[in-house]
Curated annotation (Swiss-Prot):
UniProt motif NPA 2: location: 230-232
A single cellular component GO annotation: plasma membrane
Compartment annotation: Cell membrane
Protein family according to the UniProt entry: Belongs to the MIP/aquaporin (TC 1.A.8) family. PIP (TC 1.A.8.11) subfamily.
Listed transmembrane segments: 41-61, 79-99, 128-148, 170-190, 202-222, 252-272
Function: Aquaporins facilitate the transport of water and small neutral solutes across cell membranes.
Record's comment describing the protein's domains: Aquaporins contain two tandem repeats each containing three membrane-spanning domains and a pore-forming loop with the signature motif Asn-Pro-Ala (NPA).
Annotated motif NPA 1, positions: 109-111
Protein's name according to its UniProt entry: Aquaporin PIP2-7
């Protein structure tokens, strides 16, 4: 077990503060399947992703309707614009992570779950169950949005993510990889147990930088891909809207986020935190 010792000064005296990394989550834990807390967490992920898709898809549709110049009195400058859409996505993530962090960890994104799995923060069983719940919630959330505003949903694209005209698939894939890297790197940094042990205010503030990361990435990548960085967010509307273009581009919104999440997990855990070096040192000391 890795151990860091920090010296803190208080009234001219030095005292040692020991910190131990929490044990890594097991790859497969059969006992976890018998615990209600696992299923409660999956339900929380389902509901959170449902609400996330419902609000954000309706925000996109509302913006497109308000800026539709075919409607008398509308101009291209009407509506919330890209800034408003980015705020809707970032704001909802902030709210939902805050609400569900103590129950499920507040992933609301298969890419985040995948990154945390690679970082040994969650087991394979929990990761798979979360991803299923997130995708199911996304489908239901997009379905609710269509149910409430069916005509506008069909007319304005249903919040589906596709590669924008003028950009090739390679550029779109790169945008998704980098955008997801920013998000997952922020998640690892905001939930770092060492920082949480040192600064008691960090866990309370964690939803804020995560939501703000989502906001900033949307500002940068909405013009390119519509911003996925969340496979469930792209999958749900694609299932409900069922458009050929959405399915043709769908792989970008899975491969990009998973690659970005993997790179972020490796960078944080094995370079910044030096987990590989610590593990090697522990192995040598035990030998």
């Amino acid at each position: 077990m890795a151990k860091d010792v920090e010296q803190v000064t208080e009234q001219g005296e030095y005292s040692a503060k020991d910190y131990h990394d929490p044990p890594p989550a097991p790859l497969i834990d059969p006992d976890e399947l018998t615990k209600w807390s696992l299923y409660r967490a999956a339900i929380a992920e389902f509901i959170a992703t449902l609400l996330f898709l419902y609000i954000t898809v309706l925000t996109i549709i509302g913006y497109k309707r308000q800026s539709d110049t075919k409607i008398p009195g509308n101009t291209e400058c009407d509506g919330v614009g890209i800034l408003g859409i980015a705020w809707a996505f970032g704001g909802m993530i902030f709210i939902l992570v805050y609400c569900t962090a103590g129950i499920s960890g507040g992933h609301i994104n298969p890419a985040v779950t995948f990154g945390l799995f690679l970082g040994r923060k969650v087991s394979l069983v929990r990761a798979l169950l979360y991803m299923i719940a997130q995708c199911a919630g996304a489908i239901c959330g997009a379905g609710l949005a269509k149910g409430f505003q069916k005509s506008f949903y069909n007319r304005y694209g249903g919040g589906v993510n596709t590669v924008s005209d003028g950009y090739n698939k390679g550029t779109a894939l790169g945008a998704e990889i980098i955008g997801t890297f920013v998000l997952v790197y922020t998640v690892f940094s905001a939930t770092d147990p060492k920082r949480n042990a040192r600064d008691s205010h960090v866990p309370v503030l964690a939803p804020l930088p995560i939501g703000f990361a989502v906001f900033m990435v949307h500002l940068a990548t909405i013009p390119v891909t519509g911003t996925g960085i969340n496979p469930a967010r792209s999958f749900g509307p694609a299932v409900i809207f069922n458009n050929d273009k959405a399915w043709d581009d769908q792989w970008i919104y899975w491969v990009g986020p998973f690659v970005g999440a993997a790179v972020a997990a490796i960078y944080h855990q094995y370079i910044l935190r030096g987990s590989a070096i610590k593990a090697l040192g522990s192995f040598r000391s035990n030998a």
